[in-house]
């Protein structure tokens, strides 16, 4: 298949999921419940620990505060580090659904079984985007300073530069109002940087879009990136079209996130609550999590299976046993 059609993929995904031996929605429900449950548990424990830390004062409580703070950091790191590997397990399940194979709870642990390759892929890809960000900052700063857009910033900073040798005068100038003026003057810089980063990073993002599936297919990190780049050559726009066909799904995900932060968003709009801030935090977090659980339970299996079908349609094939023993060998079915 040289061209993918979102409507065809959705129909094929529906057929595959109906024939699945183990209910895909049930598997997604288990996967999402574990992820949201762990996050909720850590949030509750952190709240309790914060109350304990606030109740310890003076030098006598310093040791206890240090221990409790360490526990908080460890719990947050565990969620931060573990969640991506858990998410990769569902990608592996989606790949099996797309191939008409059985996927069960054991497959959700595949991300941890492929720990080294998944970690290497995330580090390589993250490092690549960080380097692009640094390059964009340098380029956008140069463009900003060499154009009339920087005039406002130079005018705002002129008194600061003039008073650089006078600490008292400098202290009088450095006010919150000056900071606001600097931020407003930097808006063109941020717009230039955002536009340049999107121009550079988006094509790279789509060329590497199938690297996650390739890693779950047995490839090494470098091999997965190379396979994805080759398979999406001249086909990235098809992936963009596929993404846009699921606009409603991503919009509902954003809505779930917005609900989770309702305790911040609604007061900013002038809406007050008849209960405490802590209660508002807990209620909106639980409500947002429940909305996300329902959304993913209903639709995520279908969406991920569509991407799994696209992965196969783009000609990214599973590596042979010999290629799996050589994780840095690029493979691609031309």
Which residue ranges define each predicted feature?
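Hydrophobic alpha-helical membrane segments
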Residues: 1-334
């Amino acid at each position: 298949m040289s061209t993918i059609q979102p409507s065809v993929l959705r129909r094929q995904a529906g057929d595959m999921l109906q024939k699945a031996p183990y209910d895909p929605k049930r598997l997604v429900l288990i996967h999402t419940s574990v992820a949201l449950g762990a996050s909720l548990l850590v949030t509750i424990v952190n709240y309790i620990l914060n109350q304990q830390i606030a109740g310890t004062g003076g030098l006598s409580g310093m040791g206890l505060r240090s221990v409790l703070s360490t526990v908080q950091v460890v719990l947050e790191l565990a969620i931060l580090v573990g969640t991506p590997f858990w998410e990769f397990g569902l990608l592996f399940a989606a790949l099996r659904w797309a191939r008409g194979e059985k996927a069960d709870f054991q497959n959700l642990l595949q991300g941890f079984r492929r720990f080294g390759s998944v970690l290497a892929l995330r580090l390589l890809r993250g490092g690549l985007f960080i380097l692009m960000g640094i390059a964009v900052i340098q380029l956008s700063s140069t463009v900003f300073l060499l154009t009339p857009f920087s005039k406002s910033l130079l005018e705002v900073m002129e008194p600061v530069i003039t008073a650089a040798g006078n600490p008292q005068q400098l202290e009088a100038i450095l006010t919150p109002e000056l900071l606001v003026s600097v931020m407003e003057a930097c808006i063109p810089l941020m717009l230039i940087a955002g536009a340049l980063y999107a121009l550079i990073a988006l094509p790279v993002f789509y060329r590497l879009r199938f690297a996650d599936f390739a890693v779950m297919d047995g490839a090494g990190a470098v091999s997965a990136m190379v396979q994805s780049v080759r398979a999406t050559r001249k086909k990235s726009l098809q992936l963009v079209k596929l993404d846009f066909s699921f606009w409603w799904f991503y919009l509902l995900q954003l809505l779930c996130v917005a609900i989770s932060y309702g305790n911040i968003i609604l007061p900013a709009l002038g809406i007050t609550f008849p209960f405490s801030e802590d209660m508002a935090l807990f209620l909106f977090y639980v409500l947002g999590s429940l909305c996300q659980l329902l959304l993913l339970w209903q639709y995520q299996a279908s969406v991920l299976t569509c991407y799994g079908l696209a992965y196969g349609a783009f000609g990214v094939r599973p590596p042979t046993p010999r290629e799996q023993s050589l994780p840095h060998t690029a493979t691609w079915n031309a």
